[in-house]
């Protein structure tokens, strides 16, 4: 796997190019401001009624409609929600995209699953920082950066990779390291991590643990602390130094109990189900299901959201978080 640093990227590749960033959310604001501060000519493309227009202008950025920004741009970065990208592309990007332009993405979903099929005469690249946008921005202002992924799906002009590397450098990524991958690998591993571990697996583990304790008669408050609240303490240790750091930092009782009982929770049956989830991602079944869900008005998703909001752990959690001064907004 190739990893690139400062000396491997040249910001001059982006100079004298017009850069449009579509979207001004978590990632959009970070990319726009970092590239602007790196000396690039940046315009943010937004709907005319977007609340983000004022924010972007206040930050000193040029703002225009999506269509006009794309007409003007040599490089167009799409940092919009996955489910809205196809419609915006079909209606506002494709009719205005220059031949020889570069189309960039922060995630590979729409390219990999062929929701967006760009013409052969444009570059298609990805630059994906592996952190939230606020951290991309903060580390840049501190003179550092966060690790990034880059990928080239289509190289029409012969310099698509150089553009991706220059972009990564412009947002600070080459100071940490830039890993080369593919749209396929980024998309499939990202979706799997979200579904099986980060957003799906962990949430179900928390709820199951909470329910096991409360059904056995223990107070909901204690169940919340042990199964939800303290998870951050453990995840922070993983984040800082991996599994070994966590095992070193907890008590011997916790370490032994975790190593001997954990495999009884995440069993071979759970891993077999993970493999099925991965297969659904690889063969496109999940993508089709999600796209159909979006097109049908989010009926199932809204029902699941409501179910989660009404779970007892949310009720007791809201009460206990009210006791935590460090969580209260100043």
Swiss-Prot record:
List the molecular function annotations (GO) for this entry: ketol-acid reductoisomerase activity; magnesium ion binding; NADP binding
Keywords, sorted A to Z: Amino-acid biosynthesis, Branched-chain amino acid biosynthesis, Magnesium, Metal-binding, NADP, Oxidoreductase
Q: What class of enzyme is it?
A: oxidoreductase
Q: Where is the KARI C-terminal knotted domain?
A: 182-327
Catalytic reaction annotation: (2R)-2,3-dihydroxy-3-methylbutanoate + NADP(+) = (2S)-2-acetolactate + NADPH + H(+); (2R,3R)-2,3-dihydroxy-3-methylpentanoate + NADP(+) = (S)-2-ethyl-2-hydroxy-3-oxobutanoate + NADPH + H(+)
State the family named in the UniProt similarity comment for this chain.
Belongs to the ketol-acid reductoisomerase family.
* Name of the protein this chain belongs to: Ketol-acid reductoisomerase (NADP(+))
Q: Which organism does this record belong to? A: Chlorobaculum tepidum (strain ATCC 49652 / DSM 12025 / NBRC 103806 / TLS) (Chlorobium tepidum)
């Amino acid at each position: 796997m190739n990893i690139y640093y400062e000396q491997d990227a040249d910001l001059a590749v982006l100079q004298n190019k017009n850069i449009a960033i579509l979207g001004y959310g978590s990632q959009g604001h970070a990319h726009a401001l970092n590239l602007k501060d790196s000396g690039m000519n940046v315009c943010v493309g937004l709907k005319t009624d977007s609340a983000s227009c004022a924010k972007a202008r206040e930050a000193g950025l040029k703002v225009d409609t999506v269509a006009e920004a794309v007409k003007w741009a040599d490089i167009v970065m799409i940092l919009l929600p996955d489910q809205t990208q196809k419609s915006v592309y079909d209606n506002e990007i494709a009719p205005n995209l220059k031949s020889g332009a570069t189309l960039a993405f922060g995630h590979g979903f729409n390219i990999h699953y062929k929701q967006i099929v760009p013409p052969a005469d444009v570059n298609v690249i990805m630059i994906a920082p592996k952190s939230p946008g606020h951290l991309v921005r903060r580390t840049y202002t501190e003179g550092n950066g966060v690790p990034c992924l880059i990928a080239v799906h289509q190289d029409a002009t012969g310099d698509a990779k150089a553009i991706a590397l220059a972009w990564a450098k412009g947002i600070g990524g080459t100071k940490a390291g830039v890993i080369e991958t593919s749209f396929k690998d980024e998309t499939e591993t990202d979706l799997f991590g979200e579904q099986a571990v980060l957003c799906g697996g962990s949430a179900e583990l928390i709820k199951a643990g909470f329910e096991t304790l409360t059904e056995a008669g223990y107070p909901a408050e204690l169940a919340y602390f042990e199964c939800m609240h303290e998870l951050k303490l453990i995840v922070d240790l993983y984040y800082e130094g991996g599994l070994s750091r966590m095992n070193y930092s907890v008590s011997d009782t916790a370490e032994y109990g975790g190593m001997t009982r954990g495999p009884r929770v995440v069993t071979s049956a759970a891993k077999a189900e993970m493999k099925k989830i991965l297969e659904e991602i690889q063969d496109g079944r999940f993508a089709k299901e999600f796209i159909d869900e979006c097109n049908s008005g989010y009926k199932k998703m809204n029902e699941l959201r409501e179910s989660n909001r009404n779970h007892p752990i949310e009720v007791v959690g809201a009460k206990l978080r009210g006791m935590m001064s460090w969580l209260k907004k100043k």
